[in-house]
Amino acid sequence: MKKSLIALALILCMLLCTCGANEVATAESTEAGSIKETTPDYSNALILADQGMFSSGGTVTDPVEGTYDSTTNWLDATRAGNTAHVDHANVLYQIPAGETGNPMVFLHGYGQSRMGWMTTPDGRDGWSNIFLKKGHGVFLVDQPRRGEAGSTVTMTEDGFLDAWAADSKDYKPGDQAWYTHFRIGRVAPERYKGSQFPEGEESQNQFFRQMTPNTGSLDMAVAAEAMNAVLQDVYEMTGKKSVFVTHSQGGAIGWNVDVKNMAAIVAIEPGGTPAVGSEQYQNLLAANIPIVIYFGDYIDNGPEDIMSTGFWKGIRDGAVAFAEQYNADGGDCIVVNLPDEGITGNSHFMFQELNNQQIADHIGAWMAERGLE
């Protein structure tokens, strides 16, 4: 019995010592942790004064034939008597604290949404963040029938759109076609020598998953009308005209947008330029809109056996001819061939590539020269 009591006493002593040691260790680690803790450095943090979303433009459809029955409502697949708000643009905006420059409105190209401006395939800052840090409010558009502006007239033409019907539109795969046509590499996943496109399987995965289809037919006039409303809404919000940044197919839309609320156009490899003497050309010239048009690499030095190489040469040659005449008529237009500036390795998606900050700085300098910084 005595031995048992002694053994029990020893066990209790050991437990108490262990607890004490743990408490001391915890205290020391807590104390050490508090010593190591420092106030986070927010000196370079991006601080927003405001952000939000809104829709601009669009129409309301005529009611579907028949009378709306509130008792069956959603279960009535004919949608009789229903209307739909359609063919608008959707805008996500962010305003930096201490905003100094003109607002910038970004319009994506074909198969993309505003996401392309907001990030990169490898997760770095996209141009929206970069230009926010330069003091510009950014307004990121999803054009009609794309992304978060997907509502379109096809929703009511047949009463109720059945996504599983036999006659539904098929999505056409295009990963490899995109990759080649937009000069990332000859065949995915290989990249051209010196490419600025982010390397690695996951970067390519993230890039391809940005692509999104139209929900209805592509209608340039509908898109341009919605963009007129966007620029008007931005002007009413900010009291300033916008620097209108377009890409690819968005560039083709951009030339048809009303110039009254534009401060300048930055076109990234636009899908063509206005014909000299056309109504679009004359409107831009009369409003004295400064224009800069950017082209990347692998155009002069792209594979000659790939049709897209000749395509991009033609697009760029057209832009150069446009700029020459625009300037001769008293306008201000510059075509920037990035390799001529010592900036190499860029594809059609230069705003997502490893040197996107450098190109944004180049645009920023052009804007500053025109009082738009």
Give the positions of each predicted feature.
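N-terminal cap/lid segment of alpha/beta-hydrolase-fold proteins
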Residues: G33-E99
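The feature captures the conserved acid-bearing segment of alpha/beta-hydrolase catalytic domains
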Residues: A267-L338
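Catalytic active-site module of serine/aspartate enzymes centered on a nucleophile-bearing elbow/loop
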Residues: G345, F349-E373
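Short beta-strand element of the alpha/beta-hydrolase
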Residues: G101-G109
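Gly/Ala-rich beta-loop-alpha elbow adjacent to hydrolase catalytic centers
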Residues: V245-G254
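Conserved acidic catalytic loop of the alpha/beta-hydrolase fold
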Residues: A221-S242
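Conserved alpha/beta-hydrolase
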Residues: R124-A149
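Active-site glycine-rich loops that stabilize anionic/oxyanionic intermediates
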Residues: H108-T120, G271
